[in-house]
Design a protein with these regions (language model features):
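Non-heme di-metal
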Residues: 1-202
């Protein structure tokens, strides 16, 4: 396998419980609400990284269009809800993301903190991609299947971008590969503790 394929393989070590997609379809208004706020938080996270690392030209150039894309996707989810006569609900605490944020290294150099943040974002995008794929394959509504296939493709691209940025700013590839594996191992154990919920994307 080539280095590029190895680098970009999702590598998730525990698949989502297949029952989750059916649960999500039954609670569509709740899952769309959570999805909308996931897009909003992704927008905010990209802006935050740009603010923290304004002199990292490649990061700024690559994340700037993602800010626009993520906010546009928030609006797409809202529009889809309105078409279906649904109301955006309250934002909920994302246990999955909170746990990953706690796993991030906060001490050390700014470069180490940046690499860890990029890897955390890459993992969130990878899991989102996997879940969007489940929805695109299992939801009965063909329009929603297409809707979530589009999001799956988008998240796959964001995952690759975040991981590639981590490699770009790291001092060596071995460090990134080792830390990425630590994230994957941590996420596997985390997934074992989180019960599938119909009102959560993660």
């Amino acid at each position: 396998m080539s280095e590029t394929k190895t680098k970009y393989k999702l590598g998730l070590q525990l698949p989502t419980d297949p029952r989750w997609a059916n649960m999500a379809e039954i609670s569509l208004e709740e899952i769309l609400t959570d999805h909308a706020f996931c897009e909003q938080k992704a927008t905010t996270s990209c802006i935050s990284l740009i603010q923290k690392y304004p002199k990292h030209t490649r990061l700024v150039n690559e994340l700037s269009p993602v800010v626009t894309e993520e906010w546009g996707q928030f609006r797409l989810v809202i529009a889809e809800m309105e078409k279906r006569g649904m109301q955006l609900g309250e934002q909920r605490n994302d246990e999955y993301v909170v746990a990953l944020r706690k796993f991030q290294k906060k001490d050390g150099s700014r470069k180490t903190a940046l690499i860890d943040a990029l890897l955390a974002f890459a993992l969130i995008e990878a899991r989102s991609c996997e879940r969007f794929r489940l929805l695109s394959l299992n939801i009965s509504d063909p329009k929603l299947r297409d809707f979530y296939h589009m999001f799956m493709v988008s998240e796959a691209g964001h995952y690759r971008m975040f991981l590639d940025l981590a490699y770009h700013y790291a001092e060596n590839n071995v460090f990134v590969k080792n830390r990425w594996q630590q994230y994957l191992d941590f996420e596997e154990e985390l997934m074992k503790t989180l019960k599938p919920r119909a009102d959560r994307m993660h």
